[in-house]
Swiss-Prot record:
Gene Ontology biological process terms, A to Z: COPII vesicle coating; endoplasmic reticulum to Golgi vesicle-mediated transport; neural crest cell development; neural crest formation; protein monoubiquitination; Wnt signaling pathway
Biochemical pathway: Protein modification; protein ubiquitination
Function: Substrate-specific adapter of a BCR (BTB-CUL3-RBX1) E3 ubiquitin ligase complex that acts as a negative regulator of Wnt signaling pathway and ER-Golgi transport. The BCR(KLHL12) complex is involved in ER-Golgi transport by regulating the size of COPII coats, thereby playing a key role in collagen export, which is required for embryonic stem (ES) cells division: BCR(KLHL12) acts by mediating monoubiquitination of SEC31 (SEC31A or SEC31B).
UniProt-annotated stretches for the region Interaction with DVL3: 405-568
Organism: Mus musculus
Residues annotated as domain BACK: 135-236
Post-translational modification remark: Ubiquitinated by the SCF(FBXL17) complex, leading to its degradation by the proteasome: ubiquitination by the SCF(FBXL17) complex takes place when aberrant BTB domain dimers are formed.
UniProt gene name: Klhl12
Protein name: Kelch-like protein 12
Subunit organization: Component of the BCR(KLHL12) E3 ubiquitin ligase complex, at least composed of CUL3 and KLHL12 and RBX1. This complex interacts with DVL3 upon activation of the Wnt signaling pathway by WNT3A. Interacts with DRD4, KLHL2 and SEC31A. Interacts with PEF1 and PDCD6/ALG-2; interaction takes place in response to cytosolic calcium increase and leads to bridge together the BCR(KLHL12) complex and SEC31 (SEC31A or SEC31B).
Signal peptide span: none
Keyword match Ubl conjugation: yes
Record domain BTB: where: 33-100
Pfam families on file: BACK, BTB, Kelch_1, Kelch_KLHDC2_KLHL20_DRC7
Amino acid sequence: MGGIMAPKDIMTNTHAKSILNSMNSLRKSNTLCDVTLRVEQKDFPAHRIVLAACSDYFCAMFTSELSEKGKPYVDIQGLTAATMEILLDFVYTETVHVTVENVQELLPAACLLQLKGVKQACCEFLESQLDPSNCLGIRDFAETHNCVDLMQAAEVFSQKHFPEVVQHEEFILLSQGEVEKLIKCDEIQVDSEEPVFEAVINWVKHAKKEREESLPDLLQYVRMPLLTPRYITDVIDAEPFIRCSLQCRDLVDEAKKFHLRPELRSQMQGPRTRARLGANEVLLVVGGFGSQQSPIDVVEKYDPKTQEWSFLPSITRKRRYVASVSLHDRIYVIGGYDGRSRLSSVECLDYTADEDGVWYSVAPMNVRRGLAGATTLGDMIYVSGGFDGSRRHTSMERYDPNIDQWSMLGDMQTAREGAGLVVASGIIYCLGGYDGLNILNSVEKYDPHTGHWTNVTPMATKRSGAGVALLNDHIYVVGGFDGTAHLSSVEAYNIRTDSWTTVTSMTTPRCYVGATVLRGRLYAIAGYDGNSLLSSIECYDPIIDSWEVVASMGTQRCDAGVCVLREK
């Protein structure tokens, strides 16, 4: 061989594995073994050097002046022979067999013998098995064995799935202190305080004699001022445990005062009036009409916890006058106008598919619709009204994602484009819009059980292109256009009393504005103020009846689709 060859260190990929395999064969044939581990009268031949290399426990045993240092036999207490066999297999093969049946013995044994790899494998296995019925037990198990990452994962899981967790026996069997720790946490994800109150009452009722005295202590961590007045009067006031306790009554009176005396709310701020962080939800804004005076395909995501915007993959077709809803971790972008024609096509974002999500087409609607209203009820998507390029529609259709099919339903009484569609207490409401001649203030509701539309009390103001959302038993209608002016005004419909009230106006007029609810607050997104497209967002707090501007999007737009999705 000619030329000068430089030396090179070469590492093979098989050497370490080959050595392990050879040592395991020597162990199984009891060759060169220099120690025997005795567990439950069963002997396990092994090599001191291998045990010491894998375990600090054995390293200390064989290198210090412990009595076992020179003994040919070592008795191991605190684990079973079956568990010892699994642990030795790991020492010699790098593989551990973890099952639901053995993990509760395997993890403590791994901690005892200081086998970090087995401990980590058990923790990862238990984390993969978390569900609402076992997360509290796994959290305690992890805490006992100082598995910090697993304990935190179980804690987060119990917070994220609180309404389901409290339905299971593990919650009912918690101590008072453990219940307090859970319900006082800001991070539990609930849409309202109702499941928190009900969890406390159910826990007390499970052992009434022993736990009744604990109710006032627990109830102070329920944020009753954030409950609706109706729930306070109809449910909490009727609860016998509450009526029999002066301390509990004081907490209920505080909640009533919070609602009846809004001028005192600023003085009553504290832990019970602070909203929980809620579900890990994000706001998505899709398509619309952009600053280039044409439909756009841009998708942006807002995280209310960080107050930051980021971009997601664009929709496959540019659309304005678009409707959008979320259902089962998917976002549906429905109809709209691409600059040439109104659309019946529907795109779906599978947000669980990968880091950013994947857009794909689903079945088109039966009717082309721009400026249609869209909402969800149960497992279905409902779309009503809209403009097909020649006429406004009274029709409504429903999409079943399980069979990827649209079906026509009963017609509205009035043709509408630019109307809002929202569900409240199982009823679909369609609000305002434009019928081709007039801007509308009329409102009609659809009962899915009868298939019929009926009129309800109209809005105080005619509005088309308004944002509509449900918050605390009230349907809020924000902004829009009344035929002469772009509106900043906001009104709220009480579904219980069939009546409207005016609330504080937005800081900016907004037409073709998106509206949605996130973490107990109402968001008004982008729109057109009569002079320019907007990228600004403002947020309404119903407790203090006030709007504040939050972080702006990167894109100015109106006519966009807006919805909320639970973050991965």
